[in-house]
Design a protein with these regions (language model features):
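Conserved segment of winged-helix/HTH DNA-binding domains
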Residues: 79-108, 125-127, 132-137
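Short, solvent-exposed recognition segments
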Residues: 136-205
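Glycine-rich acetyl-CoA-binding "A-motif" of GNAT/NAT acetyltransferases
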Residues: 223
Length: 263
């Protein structure tokens, strides 16, 4: 039987003070990330703690290499790049997915992305710019709502009904006037996506940007991510959007799945 005290570390697992300290440290990091830098006084006000307490937390995080201080303002340190890269490459699919996303961008001329689902959200693991691509906010590491993106809906269509329900229960955030916010409408579309094999995003995440996404599954049939291509809606329309790009996308996705099978 395990004791509440870890015999190796001496840490008391039931000590609420230790948990609160950890939670507050992470809250500070989230505040600094959200606001792209914070002053100690802002941290103290946001967290309802004294100025001295805020300074202690900030100085400790600086000492540990997680924050840097510039002109009295605290920012996230580059250490997070190292941590993020390790987390990203922990996904075995990443290293080879990068190669196929590059192929997809080159063949389509569009911006391509590879995303995965984690904690009921989508995360961009890789993005590649084609010859005619535009910037679409698809930065590596960015978290996105699955229901508002082509790759996200492709993943959703491959998840269990229970997991889809949990994602819907979080709320279907409206990103544009075209975002699907009705659970019944989303479920109907997911059925179509399963039958068709790919998903469309018609200006549902960013006004003026369309996208097509397809799920990537492993040998057991479990979805491990999704590729997508995106571009301006005035270019991605008609047969190019509904037929040509889906065929390019499915071809490269199938090649990648074959590589997974043979590896």
């Amino acid at each position: 039987m395990l004791s509440a005290v870890d015999s190796q570390t001496g840490m008391n697992d039931t000590n609420p003070e230790k948990l609160t300290t950890i939670e507050q440290a992470f809250e500070i990091l989230e505040l600094i990330h959200t606001n792209n830098g914070e002053k100690p006084s802002d941290i103290a006000d946001s967290m309802d703690v004294s100025s001295s307490t805020a300074h202690r937390y900030l100085n400790t995080l600086v000492e540990k290499g997680y924050l840097v201080k510039e002109d009295g303002v605290y920012y996230l340190a580059l250490k997070f790049l190292t941590l993020g890269e390790r987390a990203r490459t922990r996904k075995n699919v990443y290293t080879s997915a990068e190669e196929y996303a590059d192929m997809l961008a080159e063949e389509s001329g569009c911006r391509s992305t590879f995303i995965v689902e984690e904690n009921l959200q989508g995360i961009y693991l890789y993005t590649s710019a084609g010859s005619h691509s535009v910037w679409t906010q698809s930065t590596i590491g960015k978290r996105i709502p699955l229901h508002a993106t082509a790759g996200g809906k492709a993943i959703l269509a491959s998840l269990s009904d229970d997991k889809v329900a949990r994602i819907i229960d979080q709320g279907l955030e409206r990103k544009t006037s075209s975002t699907i916010t009705s659970a019944s409408t989303l479920r109907e579309q997911l059925t179509t996506i399963r039958d068709r094999g790919y998903a469309f995003n018609r200006e549902e995440q960013i006004q003026g940007v369309n996208a097509v996404g397809a799920p990537v599954t492993d040998n057991s049939g479990e979805v491990i991510g999704a590729f997508s291509v995106s571009g301006p809606s005035n270019r991605l329309n008609g047969d190019r959007f509904t037929s040509e790009l889906p065929q390019i996308l499915l071809g490269i996705t199938n090649e990648y799945e074959l590589r997974i099978t043979l590896s």
